[in-house]
Amino acid sequence: MNLSPREKDKLLVSMAAMVARRRLERGVKLNHPEAIALISDFIVEGARDGRSVAELMQAGAEVLTRAQCMDGIAEMIHDIQVEATFPDGTKLVTVHQPIR
């Protein structure tokens, strides 16, 4: 199976998001990379499901709470930008203050 660098990146983010979900289920607080991966995966999958950019920008900020992350993680992440494939093409989705 030959994957492009972009496909490899998407696969890595997806795998990291799976790990993050399992940790949340066990009650483990997420670190910086896990939080980024979980929110990014939510956006990519939402785009594939046909949700709009505006919808994902709003919903992306509701994926995680401060209580689900290690101390200081919410302050470290100001914005998350994800290039996602929508039914009408690839678009950049920006989520401001994603962990509230």
UniProtKB/Swiss-Prot annotation:
Pathway: Nitrogen metabolism; urea degradation; CO(2) and NH(3) from urea (urease route): step 1/1. One of its GO terms (cellular component) is cytoplasm. It catalyses: urea + 2 H2O + H(+) = hydrogencarbonate + 2 NH4(+). Signal peptide: none annotated. Keywords: Cytoplasm, Hydrolase. One of its GO terms (molecular function) is urease activity. It comes from the Bacteria. One of its GO terms (biological process) is urea catabolic process. It is found in: Cytoplasm. It holds the Pfam family Urease_gamma. Its EC number is 3.5.1.5. Gene3D superfamilies: Urease, gamma-like subunit. NCBIfam families: PRK13241.1 (NF009712), urease_gam (TIGR00193). Belongs to the urease gamma subunit family. Heterotrimer of UreA (gamma), UreB (beta) and UreC (alpha) subunits. Three heterotrimers associate to form the active enzyme. This is Urease subunit gamma. It comes from Rhodopseudomonas palustris (strain BisA53). The lineage of its organism: Bacteria, Pseudomonadati, Pseudomonadota, Alphaproteobacteria, Hyphomicrobiales. The gene is ureA.
